């Protein structure tokens, strides 16, 4: 059941990289869902152009306090342009009476000051959070780690997609290596590997604190925000069906089997996208071996050192262990079919 039956809704799928978000979108079969539209690029990612600037070695290797005036202006202008493009798309889509389902990685629309703090540690002279210009307001509360003002975030009903860090983090590093090579991936204290569950938890708590302001009926407000775990997407289709019902999608449209991409189709795909989605493109259905069932961080850390080298393995292990408390916090609150 949708938040407001008969009225278009805004549904935000908020994730971090390698959480099986592309698999979820494949299963949801958004093109077949009546009265729903997804973001124009891979189901969303409106803020990817800003992230493309921020991951350039010349930017990511330095804290925000060391950026030049031109670099700061470039990043700010990019975030504003991304936001305005999203606004235009929303207006055009909603004018057709369609609900929107958009995904975004937290790292894509994270406030650059929060991003710098995560990578380099809090600055003793921390500057105010960066916020895009929005006619609806400019409030930026502490738990809001994005460049979006509170008022805009609260026009959405959010779902947080999570995955065990011991699977997500090394998987991300593998894609960085494919994109940049081993030397660049490990440069500048692994500046290329910017990932965290902390931001998902912070935004989740932000939405919990503001439930009464969410665009849904009072009797539904306690259902939001929602959390999906990749393990349930992989192993528990009933949870995905339940989720569909809650957001007004048709569970009968769910797709659990598909055709493998042909070689000529793969040759037309941009290399970076191919690196991120090759396993999905080569599949014909859900691979249940991708779940975290039985995973042990000690055992995995040994594998990372063998695969990437001691320094990289140690770094990934540190990130994973540091993320586990936030992951377990969110996982305990996830949507499950056995408890509705």
Curated annotation (Swiss-Prot):
User: Which top EC class is given?
Assistant: transferase
Q: What is its EC number?
A: 2.8.2.-
Give the domain of life.
Eukaryota
- Which pathway does the UniProt entry assign to this protein? Secondary metabolite biosynthesis
Keywords for this protein: Transferase
Instruction: Tell me the GO molecular function terms.
Output: transferase activity
Transferase keyword on record: yes
Q: Which PANTHER family does the record match to this protein? A: SULFOTRANSFERASE DOMAIN-CONTAINING PROTEIN
State the protein's purpose.
Sulfotransferase; part of the gene cluster that mediates the biosynthesis of pyrrolopyrazines, secondary metabolites showing insecticidal activity. The role of ppzF within the pathway has still to be determined. The single multifunctional NRPS ppzA is sufficient to produce peramine via condensation of 1-pyrroline-5-carboxylate and arginine, N-methylation of the alpha-amino group of arginine and reduction of the thioester and the cyclization to form an iminium ion resulting in release from the peptide synthetase.
Q: What is this protein called?
A: Sulfotransferase ppzF
- The source organism is Metarhizium rileyi (strain RCEF 4871)
Q: What is the lineage of its organism?
A: Eukaryota, Fungi, Dikarya, Ascomycota, Pezizomycotina
